[in-house]
């Protein structure tokens, strides 16, 4: 089967690699550097499994800048373009998705379009009405950055949307796509759910908001424990051994961040509109309170020091271990709070060559020099290369994992 994938981020590329094991896949991107890397068997993103598969597996995959040619020949078109949250309108910016839909429909009269981008509840219905077609369906992704292909190979569930009154072809394509994902997976007995588009859209936003809730819960627990001088590790362990709660996703942090949780929680809150709720709003608020609390704790530690020059060293901007981006990283908001108090900030981030021009922080990418300059070293996730200056480190990383 010929499949086109719009977007070579971790969602689009991982799906492209997965499906190219048994199908002919063309990745469409607007960046020549990404296209060149994929065509040379290199991954433009950090993902161990994607890197290995591109290098070692027999894949039928190519990348192109020529979107029209790719879409024209495709039987299925997967859309995995960004939908960043627009704080001005308090809604996802879906313009990239809509642009692809319009372009595909202009050159292809038969392909079914499968949206993998995270979208607002009701978006598929809106697009079907706007473009007067039922050939637009939704399949939410549940992937982690840096482990996207692994999560596609071992999925927790597969969800594809379809409506009762859809044409036989669209119904067949929805089932076919679900089967493609299931047959490419290494995990056996993966649950497959076919549901309405609005239900599928809701699953995605509510799932990520629950994860954000869990992060916020253990962060608030940790805030209480640190404030009352309790052993947070012991309290969390004592709670988490209850099978109903579980010993997972319970490691305190500076706040939830990354590409998905911040924007998805805000979008779900926006979707509630006039529907009664308090919990969803509280999750978003809790994350902001946590970051303010962390900044205050750092300031308190600084004030206890006698040094006339007080420098906060931020070790890594990445949100998670082994990540390769800083999108919505909680530490960035903590830095902004500290800078508003005229505190000098130095940053160790080997993935950066320079900071943005308006940034008042200083990039120090010699680790030993960084350690010497900083009065306190702040890190969301602890790393063993800080072991020799452990007495300088402030972190709420209790379990040494994400």
UniProtKB/Swiss-Prot annotation:
Identify the residues that bind NAD(+).
Answer: 2-19, 29, 34, 83, 118, 145, 259, 263, 327
Per the Swiss-Prot or TrEMBL record, the active site comprises 260 (nucleophile)
Q: Which pathway does it operate in?
A: Nucleotide-sugar biosynthesis; UDP-alpha-D-glucuronate biosynthesis; UDP-alpha-D-glucuronate from UDP-alpha-D-glucose: step 1/1
What does the record list as GO biological process? polysaccharide biosynthetic process; UDP-glucuronate biosynthetic process
Superkingdom of source = Bacteria
Q: Where does substrate bind?
A: 141-145, 204, 208, 249-253, 257, 320
Hydrolase keyword on record: no
The EC designation for this entry is 1.1.1.22
Q: Which keywords fit this entry according to its UniProt record?
A: Capsule biogenesis/degradation, NAD, Oxidoreductase
Signal peptide residue numbers? none
Show the GO MF annotations.
NAD binding; UDP-glucose 6-dehydrogenase activity
Q: Does the keyword Aminoacyl-tRNA synthetase apply?
A: no
> What is catalyzed by this enzyme?
UDP-alpha-D-glucose + 2 NAD(+) + H2O = UDP-alpha-D-glucuronate + 2 NADH + 3 H(+)
Question: What does the UniProt function comment say about this protein?
Answer: Catalyzes the formation of UDP-glucuronic acid which is required for capsular hyaluronic acid synthesis.
Regarding protein family, the annotation reads: Belongs to the UDP-glucose/GDP-mannose dehydrogenase family.
| NCBIfam families assigned | NDP-sugDHase
Q: What is the name listed in the Swiss-Prot or TrEMBL entry for this protein?
A: UDP-glucose 6-dehydrogenase
Q: Which gene encodes it?
A: hasB
């Amino acid at each position: 089967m010929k499949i086109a994938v719009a977007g070579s981020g971790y969602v689009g590329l991982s799906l492209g690699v997965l499906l190219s094991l048994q199908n002919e896949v063309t990745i469409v991107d607007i960046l020549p550097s990404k296209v060149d890397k994929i065509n040379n068997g290199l991954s433009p993103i950090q993902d161990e499994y994607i890197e290995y598969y591109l290098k070692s597996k027999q894949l039928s995959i190519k990348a192109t800048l020529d979107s029209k040619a790719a879409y024209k020949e495709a039987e299925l078109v997967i859309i995995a373009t960004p939908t960043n949250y627009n704080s001005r309108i308090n809604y996802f910016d879906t313009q990239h998705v809509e642009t692809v839909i319009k372009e595909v429909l202009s050159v292809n009269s038969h392909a079914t379009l499968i949206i993998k981008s995270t979208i607002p509840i009701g978006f598929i219905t809106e697009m079907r009405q706007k473009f007067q077609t039922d050939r637009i369906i939704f399949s939410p992704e549940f992937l982690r950055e840096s482990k996207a292909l692994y999560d596609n190979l071992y999925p927790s569930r597969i969800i594809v949307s379809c409506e009762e009154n859809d044409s036989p072809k669209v119904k067949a394509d929805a089932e076919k796509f679900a089967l493609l994902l299931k047959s490419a997976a290494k995990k056996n007995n993966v649950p497959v759910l076919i549901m309405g588009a609005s239900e599928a859209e809701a699953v995605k936003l509510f799932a990520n908001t629950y994860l954000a809730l869990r992060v916020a819960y253990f962060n608030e627990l940790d805030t209480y424990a640190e404030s009352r001088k309790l052993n947070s590790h012991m309290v969390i362990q004592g709670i988490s051994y209850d099978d109903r709660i579980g010993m997972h996703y319970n490691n305190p942090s500076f706040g939830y961040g990354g590409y998905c949780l911040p924007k998805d929680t805000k979008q779900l809150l926006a979707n509630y509109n006039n529907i009664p709720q308090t919990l969803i709003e509280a999750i978003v608020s809790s994350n902001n309170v946590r970051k303010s609390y962390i900044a205050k704790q750092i300031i308190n530690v600084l004030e206890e020091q006698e040094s006339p020059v007080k420098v906060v060293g931020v070790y890594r901007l990445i949100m998670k271990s082994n990540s390769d981006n800083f999108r919505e990283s909680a530490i960035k908001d903590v830095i902004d709070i500290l800078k508003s108090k005229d505190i000098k900030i130095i940053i160790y981030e080997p993935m950066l060559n320079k900071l943005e021009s308006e940034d008042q922080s200083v990039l120090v990418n010699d680790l030993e020099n960084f350690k010497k300059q900083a009065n306190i070293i702040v890190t969301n996730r602890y790393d063993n290369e800080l072991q020799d200056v452990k007495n300088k480190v402030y972190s709420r990383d209790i379990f040494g994992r994400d």
